Amino acid sequence: MAGLGGSQIPDGEFTAVVYRLIRDARYAEAVQLLGGELQRSPRSRAGLSLLGYCYYRLQEFALAAECYEQLGQLHPELEQYRLYQAQALYKACLYPEATRVSLLLLDNPAYHNRVLRLQAAIKYSEADLPGARSLVEQLLSEGGEDSGGENELDGQVNLGCLLYKEGHYEAACSKFSAALQASGYRPDLSYNLALAYYSSRHYALALKHIADIIEHGIRQHPELGVGMTTVGIDVRSVGNTVVLHQTALVEAFNLRAAIEYQLRNYEAAQEALTDMPPRAEEELDPVTLHNQALMNMDARPTEGFEKLQFLLQQIPFPPETFGNLLLLYCEYEYFDLAADVLAENAHLTYEFLTPYLYDFLDAMVTCQTAPEEAFIKLDGLAGMLTEQLRKLTIQVQEARHNKDDEAVKKAVNEYEDTLEKYIPVLMAQAKIYWNLENYPMVEKLFRKSVEFCNDHHVWKLNVAHVLFMQENKYKEAIGFYEPIVKKHYDNILNVSAIVLANLCVSYIMISQNEEAEELMRKIGKEEEQLSYDDPDKKIYHLCIVNLVIGTLYCAKGNYDFGISRVIKSLEPCNKKLGTDTWYYAKRCFLSLLENMSKHTIMLRDSVIQECVQFLEHCELYGRDIPAVIEETLEEERMHIGKNTVTYESRELKALIYEIIGWNM
C-alpha cells in the first residue's frame, strides 16, 4: 500500500482502502488520500469527518479542529461536531477558543456533562484551580442519567489532580490509590499515583508504580521497543501513536529519570531516557526534550542550550524550562545572556519564577558587573533563608516532642527544601570571595553556615577545597576529603580526580606519605581492572593525581622531580593525553620555561632531553585533542589548527630550544 495515490485505487474501493488504513493506524497515508478527495468534493461530510479523526490521531489537533469547524458550519444541526471541535482546540492548548465553542453546547442536555468535564479540564490547564474544582464538584453533585460508577470514578480522579496541583500530595495519593483499586490497572492512574508519590518524596513507592507501567507496556506492546536504544540496537521510530500515549511509557520513563536525577544517580537517569520507546528528535514531546537537555548538559552543553531555547518558543512548554535555562546560563557564566532572556521575557517571570528564584537570578546577573552589590543582594536572601531554617528547626523539635510523625515529616521536608535554596546562595557568596582569592573570607562564610550545612555534601566538599587552598590547613582539609573518599572507597573511581589529588597532596604536605602511596595504589588497581574490562576507555584519575603532585613540586621550585613526575604521569601518551591532563602539564612547562628564561633555575641536560622527547610524543598523539575546550556559546571560534595539543606542544618545544640556545 506504500505510496498509493487516489488515482491508483479501483472504482468503488476508495472508502474501503481509507478504512483499512485507519484500521492499521496508517493515519498519515489516510490523510493524503482524504486530502486529494476533498479537493474534488470539499463539502463531503464523510471526508471531513474522517480527515478530522485522522488529524486527531496524529495529534495535529489544530488541523482536526479546522475540520470539525467546517463540519459544524455545514451541518449545524449535528452538535457533536462542535464538541469535537472544542476537544481538539483544548488539545491544541487553544483554551479561550475551546471555552467559547464549548459554551455553545452547555444548554444541550445530551452534552451537558461532557461539556462541564471539558471546561473543568480547560480551567485546570489554565491554572484556574478554584474554577476547575467548582465544575468537578458540580458534576459530582448533579448526577443524572449520564452519570454512574465510571463518572464517579473520573470525578474522584479529577479531585485527586486538583489536590496534587494545590500541593496536597498525600491526599492526592489517597484519591488515586482508591481509584486504582476500584478500576483495576490503568496506566494513566498508575502514573498519577507515581507522580504524587514522587512529589511527596516517597521515591521507592513511585518507582514501584513506574515499574508496573513499564512491565505492562513491555508485555502488552513489545513492538514499542522499550530498552532497545540503550542496549545499542538500531531501531526505527515508533512514532507518537495513540497506543504509545495510552501505555504512559514516555511519562513513566521521564519520571524515573527525574527520580534518579534527584537521587544523583546520573547514569541511571540518562539510561531511563534512552530506555523509552524510540522516537525521532522532531517527534519528542516537550518534557522528554527538556529532560534530555538537562541530563546531557555536561557532555553536550551547546545542544542542551539549543533545546531549552527552542522549548521556550513553544506553547506550552514545561514550566521548569524558563528557570532552568536561566540557572544554566548563570552556571556557565553567560550572565549577559541570562540578563537578555530576563529582559525579553518579563511576562514569564511572574508566571514561572518564584520570588526567591527571581531574586537569586537577579543577584547572579549582577555579579558580573557589580560583585559588591550582588553580595549584598545574596546576603539579604541568605538572611531570609537562615531565619526560615531556624524556625523549621524549632518546628521539627516541637513535632518530635509531641510525637506527631506527620508534622515531623512535613517540617523536615520543608527544612530540606529551604536548605536546597540556601546552599546555592551561600556558594554564590563564597565564589565572589574565591574569585578574589580571599580564601579566609570564604572559610569564614562556611563557618557561619555550619549549623545548617554540616551534613550537606556540597558544603563539605567546598570547605575541603578552601582549606586546601590556604596551604597551611592541609590537616583540616584531610578531615573533610577523607570521608568523601572513604564513602566510595570500594568504587574509588566514582570520586572526582581532583578530590583524590588534593587528598594525596595534603597527605604529602604533612608527611603522611604512606597514606598517599596507599591511596595511589588503590586508584592504580581500580584503573587496571577497568582497563582490563574496557581496554579502549581512557582513565585519568591516577594521571591527574600524579600531575597535581608534580605541579606541587614545581611550585616549590623542585623542577627536576616535579617535571619528571608530570611526564611519567602521562605515560603512555596515547591513553593518558587529554584536554584536562594537557592543561595541568603545560602549566608546569610554562612555569619551568619562565624560570629558565630568568636564569633562576638550571636543569640537567638529561631532564631537558626528557622534556623534548615528551613534547614530541604529545605532538604525535595530540592531533585530534583540543588544547582548550571552547566556551559553549562563544561566537568567535579558535582557529581549528591552533586549538590542538599538537600545535601547543610544538610551541613549547620551540621555546625550550630558544631558551637553551639549541639549533632546531
Swiss-Prot record:
Residue spans of the TPR repeats: 11-44, 45-78, 153-186, 188-220, 385-418, 423-456, 458-491, 543-576
Which Gene Ontology cellular component annotation is one that this UniProt entry carries? intraciliary transport particle B
SMART domains in UniProt: TPR (SM00028)
Tell me which stretches of the chain form a coiled coil: 509-532
The record's subcellular location field reads: Cell projection, Cilium
Gene3D superfamilies assigned: Tetratricopeptide repeat domain
Coarse class of the protein's main subcellular location: other
- What PROSITE patterns does this protein map onto? TPR_REGION (PS50293)
InterPro entries (alphabetical): TPR-like_helical_dom_sf, TPR_rpt, TT30
Taxonomically, the superkingdom here is: Eukaryota
Instruction: Enumerate the UniProt keywords alphabetically.
Output: Cell projection, Cilium, Cilium biogenesis/degradation, Coiled coil, Repeat, TPR repeat
Functional description taken from the UniProt entry:
Required for polyglutamylation of axonemal tubulin. Plays a role in anterograde intraflagellar transport (IFT), the process by which cilia precursors are transported from the base of the cilium to the site of their incorporation at the tip.
Q: What is this protein called?
A: Intraflagellar transport protein 70B
The organism of origin for this protein: Bos taurus (Bovine)
